[in-house]
C-alpha cells in the first residue's frame, strides 16, 4: 500500500511530545518508521519565582506543531490527513496543574523544573520511606497545602502537562502508568493504595478533605484503548476542521516512558539515557532497591515494571549557550557557520581535548540541581592555574558537565545497590553529533553505550510507537511488540569505555566534587 493510501486509511500513528524547548510531532506508518514530522519551538518563563508555560503557550504550541506536521505530509505525499490509526500525547513529566470544578486553572502551571517543594518532598519521603522528589505532583500539592495557598480549597483535579492535553482532546482524565509514577508512587496496576491512605490522612489533618483518588487522574497500562478524539478535541488540534473525531488515543505517557520505548529499554537489566534540556537515566530493575535515596526516583515502564531513575534538571542549555557565543563570533568575523555544522565542529574538537579536560571544570546549573545538592542554579566554570586551558578542553568540560550530576546518582546504583545492566542506549539531542557524547558517557559510566539510528527522533517517535501498540499490539507484551515488530534489524552503533577516557572522566569528577562548595556559595 502506498503511503498516501496509508494516510487516508488510518494506517498511520501519531505521537506528539511536549519537550522543554520543542514540541515535536512524528507520524509513523505500519512499518513503524517515521514518515513525517513537525515541530514548534517554545520556552518556559520564569515568573514570580516559578518556571511556567501559559495555557496559551500550550494551545498555540500544540496547534502550530500539528500544522507543521500536516504541511510536511502535504509537501511529501500530496494529501492532508483526516484521521489516524491512533494518537498519543507525551510531555515533560511531573509538575502541577491544579483545576477547579469548572476546569479553570487555579495557579500558573508549575513545571518539573521548579525546586520549591523541599519541605513537602522531605516530609512525604519520610512518611512513606520512599523517595518523593521535589518535582513530583504530590510534592507540589502538599507544599501548596503547607503554604496555606488560597487556591487549595478550590481544587477539584490536578494533572500533568500530558494528562491535561489528553483531557482536552478526549474528555478523559487518565494517564499511563509511567506518567502516573511521577505524580504519586504506583504499584503494578495503579497508585499504591497503602501510600494513598497514609497521605490522605496527612492531607486531611492539614484541612484538605478531598480524597487523592478523586483529585488525581486515573491510571492505565500501555495498550489500553479507552479514549477517543472528541469533536472539540479535533477542533483544538486542527482548527481548520480537516481532522475528524473518533481517533483512538492511547494513555498519555511521560518523557521517561517514551524514552524507554524509543530505545527498546522496557525489560529488566536494560537502560537508557535521555539527554536534552534535562538528562535522565532509567534502569529497569530485576529486584527492588534495598534503600531509598534522594538522588534516585523509582518510576515504571509504560507496562508498570519498576525503574530506577536518576533525573538531573540541567543538561544541554549551558552548552547550547556556549555554542551560540561561538556562532556570534563566526558571524562577527564575516564567516557565519550554520548551526548543525557549528555543533559538529565544536563537539568533534572536544574529542581532541585532554581526558581530564586539562583541569577545567564546568557547572551547567541554570536551575537547582538536587542530585548535586544545589538548591539554585549558577552556571560557572573554574580551572587550576597550571591547567591546560584551550577550546578543546573547554568544550570537553562543557560536554562532561552535561552528565556529571547524572554520574553522581548512577554511582549509587552501581556501587551501593549493585544494579546490573546489560545495555544502555542513549537518545536525545546530545547524541546527534555521532560518537562524541556517546563516548564520554561510556567512559563516565564504565559501560557500553549504544545509539540507534533513530536517536534524534526521541520521545515523539516513542509516543507514536505506544499509539501504534494500542492498535497493532494484539496479544503481545510491549517488549515483544518492540522486539519483533519495531527494532528487529535496527541499525545502531555501540561504543565501549576507553581506559584513558575513563580515567580522565574520574579525575574530572574529583575536581567537580571538590568545587561544589563554590557552586553552593555562588548561588546564595
Range-by-range predicted roles:
Residues 1-108, 122-123, 154, 235, ...:
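N-terminal glycine/serine-rich phosphate-binding loop of ATP-dependent small-molecule kinases
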Residues 18-20, 129-253, 363-364, 395, ...:
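Gly/Ser/Thr-rich active-site cleft segment
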Residues 22, 219-229, 253, 277-279, ...:
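Glycine-rich phosphate-binding loops at beta-strand->alpha-helix junctions
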Residues 64-72, 256, 394-422, 470, ...:
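Phosphate/ATP-binding catalytic cores across multiple sugar-kinase/actin-like superfamilies
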Residues 96-122, 132, 155, 159-197, ...:
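Glycine-rich phosphate-binding loop of actin/hexokinase-like ATP-binding domains
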Residues 254, 258-262, 310-323, 396, ...:
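Glycine-rich phosphate-binding/hydrolytic loop that grips phosphoryl groups
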Residues 312, 317-320, 324-332, 336, ...:
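Acidic, glycine/GT-rich loop-and beta-edge segments that sit at the periphery of enzyme/chaperone cores
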Residues 352-453:
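Activation-segment/catalytic-loop signature of the eukaryotic protein kinase fold
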Amino acid at each position: 500500500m502506498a503511503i498516501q493510501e496509508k494516510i487516508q486509511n488510518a494506517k498511520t500513528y501519531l505521537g506528539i511530545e511536549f519537550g522543554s524547548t520543542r514540541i515535536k510531532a512524528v507520524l509513523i506508518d505500519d512499518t513503524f518508521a517515521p514518515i513525517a514530522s513537525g515541530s514548534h519551538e517554545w520556552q518556559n518563563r520564569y515568573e514570580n519565582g516559578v518556571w511556567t508555560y501559559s495555557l496559551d503557550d500550550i494551545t498555540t504550541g500544540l496547534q502550530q506543531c500539528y500544522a507543521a506536521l500536516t504541511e510536511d505530509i502535504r509537501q511529501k505525499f500530496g494529501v492532508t490527513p483526516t484521521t489516524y490509526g491512533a494518537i498519543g500525547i507525551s510531555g515533560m513529566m511531573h509538575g502541577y496543574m491544579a483545576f477547579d470544578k469548572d476546569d479553570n486553572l487555579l495557579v500558573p502551571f508549575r513545571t518539573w523544573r521548579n525546586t520549591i517543594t523541599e519541605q513537602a518532598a522531605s516530609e512525604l519521603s519520610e512518611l512513606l520511606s520512599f523517595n518523593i522528589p521535589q518535582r513530583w505532583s504530590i510534592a507540589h500539592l502538599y507544599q501548596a497545602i503547607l503554604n496555606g495557598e488560597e487556591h487549595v480549597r478550590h481544587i477539584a483535579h490536578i494533572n500533568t502537562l500530558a494528562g491535561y492535553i489528553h483531557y482536552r482532546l478526549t474528555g478523559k482524565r487518565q494517564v499511563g502508568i509511567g506518567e502516573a509514577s511521577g505524580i504519586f508512587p504506583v504499584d503494578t496496576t495503579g497508585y499504591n493504595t497503602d501510600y494513598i491512605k497514609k497521605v490522605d490522612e496527612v492531607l486531611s489533618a492539614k484541612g484538605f478533605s478531598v480524597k487523592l483518588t478523586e483529585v488525581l487522574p486515573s491510571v492505565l497500562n500501555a495498550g489500553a484503548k479507552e479514549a477517543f478524539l472528541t469533536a472539540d478535541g479535533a477542533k483544538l488540534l486542527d482548527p481548520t476542521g480537516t481532522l475528524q473525531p473518533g481517533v483512538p488515543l492511547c494513555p498519555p505517557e511521560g518523557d521517561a516512558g517514551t524514552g524507554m520505548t524509543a530505545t527498546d529499554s522496557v525489560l529488566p537489566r536494560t537502560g537508557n539515557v535521555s539527554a536534552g534540556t534535562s538528562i535522565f537515566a532509567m534502569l529497569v530493575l530485576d529486584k527492588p532497591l534495598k534503600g531509598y535515596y534522594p538522588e534516585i526516583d523509582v518510576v515504571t515502564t509504560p507496562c508498570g515494571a519498576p525503574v530506577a531513575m536518576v533525573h538531573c534538571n540541567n543538561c544541554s542549555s549551558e552548552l547550547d549557550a556556549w555554542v551560540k557565543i561561538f556562532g556570534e563570533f563566526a558571524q562577527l568575523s564575516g564567516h557565519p557557520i550554520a548551526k548543525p555544522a557549528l555543533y559538529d565542529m565544536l563537539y568533534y574538537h572536544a574529542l581532541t581535548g585532554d581526558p581530564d579536560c586539562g583541569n577545567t571544570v564546568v557547572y551547567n546549573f541554570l536551575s537547582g540541581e538536587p542530585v548535586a545538592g544545589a538548591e539554585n542554579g549558577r552556571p560557572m566554570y573554574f580551572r587550576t592555574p597550571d591547567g591546560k586551558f584551550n577550546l578543546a578542553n573547554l568544550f570537553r568540560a562543557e560536554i562532561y558537565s552535561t552528565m556529571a550530576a547524572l554520574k553522581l546518582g548512577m554511582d549509587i546504583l552501581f556501587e551501593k545497590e549493585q544494579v546490573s545492566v546489560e545495555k544502555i542506549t542513549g537518545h536525545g539531542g546530545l547524541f546527534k553529533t555521532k560518537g562524541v557524547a556517546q563516548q564520554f558517557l561510556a567512559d563516565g559510566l564504565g559501560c557500553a553505550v549504544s545509539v540507534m539510528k533513530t536517536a534524534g527522533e526521541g520521545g515523539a517517535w516513542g509516543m507514536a510507537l505506544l499509539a501504534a501498540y494500542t492498535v497493532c499490539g494484539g496479544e503481545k507484551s510491549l517488549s515483544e511488540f518492540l522486539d519483533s515488530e519495531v527494532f528487529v534489524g535496527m541499525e545502531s552503533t555501540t561504543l565501549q569505555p576507553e581506559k584513558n577516557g575513563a580515567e580522565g572522566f574520574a579525575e574530572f569528577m574529583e575536581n567537580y566534587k571538590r568545587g561544589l562548595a563554590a557552586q553552593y556559595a555562588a548561588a546564595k
